[in-house]
Amino acid sequence: PTKDAIMNFIHFRDSVNLPMYMGEIGHNTDEWQAAFCQTMQENNIGYTFWPYKKKDNSCFMGIKEPENWDKVMAFSEAPRATYKEIRDARPDQELMRKAMLDFIENSKCENCIPQVGYIHSLGLQVK
């Protein structure tokens, strides 16, 4: 994430005399992201963080995975080209309902976990 790596974009921006904007970042290590944000700031490039909440740590607020979430994911990734495949893959509906309701509850901001490393990598502070 160095200036040299994005120099072609910087030259283009300068040649057309228009601002440059990085649509989204957030899918790398905290160290890489911190260096990349610094490079963009030093070169007057705006950027957006992606996304606000997720299940892992590449976000501002982490969502705790509810019990049986692995079954929800297994169903979502199972073959469903035929009715038989759908029926064969269909998990217990009460377990799935509870897992989905728990996910909704865990997604509320007050139940999320601040991802301090990610936040610091963007040059921001946690209060």
Residue ranges and their predicted role:
Residues 3-126:
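Substrate-binding cleft of secreted/luminal carbohydrate-active enzymes
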